[in-house]
């Protein structure tokens, strides 16, 4: 038996889950937020308890030290050597990483170089990896890449219709993201449907603060909505999703607050989407509250959100030439029944119909009617478990 930590590190946060492997039992989980800021928050959940501390945590190395000390302090482990592996979620692996890998100096260097593809994510992941390697140098660290699952896309799908030199010289192409989540829920959908994954055509919709839709043909990603970076695709919590690229130079010319392309991209990443259009929040619960109050900006943001998701799902019905099931997952996908209802309401032509009594908050499973030609499933994603499984698989190959 061994204990494995699955890590999802952001620029100012470190989310973690500790597993007993190979039993896949969750022993504890938590998150450290506001790293590098005053009043950092460390939350630990274990044995039905919740412990929260307000601390000053200056960087990821301090965060990792606090995490490990908390595991001992709360009696979750007796010593560091009980931990035999650490798995790290890394958003962008580019073309270099087609599967999960054991970390070494070269791997870490490549992850930092690939930050251009995921500037909001890769730097934090690299900081988390470096911190664990410094503190626990003898423990196997594994990187699990969001992009790996999408490396099965055909060249005509992942290339953009621009001169090919930008791909050959600069590797400009579609990479996708959320691959670990899409892979996991597709596997779970096959179990739920009682059919081999290799026979199924699935559309998986990961709808959280980030949103991505994937066309899954016989267990492989054949197309996905996120692109060169996770900014592409449908409207998201704070991200715009797809826009006409000519808007970028136009805004630089027109708005004195936007001095260069980096300013515009920052606005598209952090100040757009549900938050930017509504002026209220990136949280669907707040948007739905605005709908109840007939707030016109909330209504507009919600309608754009639904419209963009429906279009991608419809597009992937064409890519797959039909589908056996549509899967909703992630924060909104799992917990926003109104959103699911309104998305499906625009897709009934494809043979989808949901049971309103099953399409309620907290329900997991098949929410479609018996007559529905395409099954509609709500499945909780578990990226952390996928990461822990890959650590278990790779830790003896170091």
From Swiss-Prot:
It is an enzyme of class 2 (transferase). GO terms for molecular function: acetate kinase activity; ATP binding; magnesium ion binding. Substrate binds at residue 89. The record marks 178, 239 as: Transition state stabilizer. It catalyses: acetate + ATP = acetyl phosphate + ADP. Pfam families: Acetate_kinase. The keyword Nucleotide-binding applies. The keyword Magnesium applies. Keywords: ATP-binding, Cytoplasm, Kinase, Magnesium, Metal-binding, Nucleotide-binding, Transferase. Its EC number is 2.7.2.1. Pathway: Metabolic intermediate biosynthesis; acetyl-CoA biosynthesis; acetyl-CoA from acetate: step 1/2. GO terms for cellular component: cytoplasm. Mg(2+). Can also accept Mn(2+). It comes from the Bacteria. ATP binds at residues 15, 206-210, 283-285, 331-335. InterPro entries: Ac/propionate_kinase, Aliphatic_acid_kin_short-chain, Aliphatic_acid_kinase_CS, ATPase_NBD. The active site is at 146 (proton donor/acceptor). Its cofactor is Mg(2+); Mn(2+). GO terms for biological process: acetate metabolic process; acetyl-CoA biosynthetic process. CDD domains: ASKHA_NBD_AcK_PK. It is found in: Cytoplasm. NCBIfam families: ackA. Belongs to the acetokinase family. PANTHER family: ACETATE KINASE (PTHR21060), ACETATE KINASE-RELATED (PTHR21060:SF15). Homodimer. This is Acetate kinase. It comes from Streptococcus pyogenes serotype M5 (strain Manfredo). The lineage of its organism: Bacteria, Bacillati, Bacillota, Bacilli, Lactobacillales.
């Amino acid at each position: 038996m061994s204990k494995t930590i699955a890590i999802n590190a952001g620029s100012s946060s470190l989310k973690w889950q500790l597993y007993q492997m190979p039993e896949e039992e969750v022993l504890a989980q938590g998150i450290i937020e506001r790293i590098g800021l005053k009043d950092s928050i460390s939350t630990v959940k274990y044995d039905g308890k919740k412990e929260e501390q307000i601390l000053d945590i200056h960087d990821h190395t301090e965060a990792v030290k606090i995490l490990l000390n908390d595991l001992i302090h709360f009696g979750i482990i007796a010593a560091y050597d009980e931990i035999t592996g650490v798995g790290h979620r890394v958003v962008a692996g580019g073309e270099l990483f087609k599967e999960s890998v054991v970390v070494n100096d070269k791997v870490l260097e490549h992850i930092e170089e690939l930050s251009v593809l995921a500037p909001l994510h890769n730097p934090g992941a690299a900081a988390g990896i470096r911190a664990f390697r410094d503190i626990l140098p003898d423990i196997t660290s594994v990187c699990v890449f969001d992009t790996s699952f999408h490396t099965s896309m055909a060249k005509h799908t992942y290339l953009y219709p621009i001169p090919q030199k930008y791909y050959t010289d600069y590797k400009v192409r579609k990479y996708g993201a959320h691959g670990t989540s899409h892979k996991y829920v597709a596997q779970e959908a096959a179990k739920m449907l009682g059919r081999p994954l290799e026979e199924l055509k699935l559309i998986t919709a990961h709808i959280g603060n980030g949103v991505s839709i994937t066309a899954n043909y016989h267990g492989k990603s054949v197309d996905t909505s996120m692109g060169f970076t996770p900014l592409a695709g449908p409207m998201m919590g704070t991200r715009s999703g797809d826009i006409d690229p000519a808007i970028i130079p136009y805004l630089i010319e027109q708005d004195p607050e936007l001095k260069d392309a980096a300013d515009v991209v920052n606005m598209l990443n952090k100040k757009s989407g549900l938050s930017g259009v509504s002026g209220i929040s990136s949280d669907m619960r707040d948007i739905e509250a605005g709908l109840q109050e007939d707030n016109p900006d909330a209504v507009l943001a919600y309608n754009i959100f639904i419209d963009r998701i429906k279009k991608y799902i419809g597009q992937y019905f064409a890519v797959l030439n039909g589908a056996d099931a549509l899967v909703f997952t992630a924060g909104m996908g799992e917990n926003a029944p109104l959103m699911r209802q309104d998305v499906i309401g625009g897709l009934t032509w494809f043979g989808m119909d949901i049971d309103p009594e099953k399409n309620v908050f907290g329900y997991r499973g098949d929410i479609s009617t018996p007559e529905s030609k395409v099954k509609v499933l709500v499945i909780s994603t578990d990226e952390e478990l996928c990461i822990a499984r890959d650590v278990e698989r790779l830790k003896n190959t170091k």
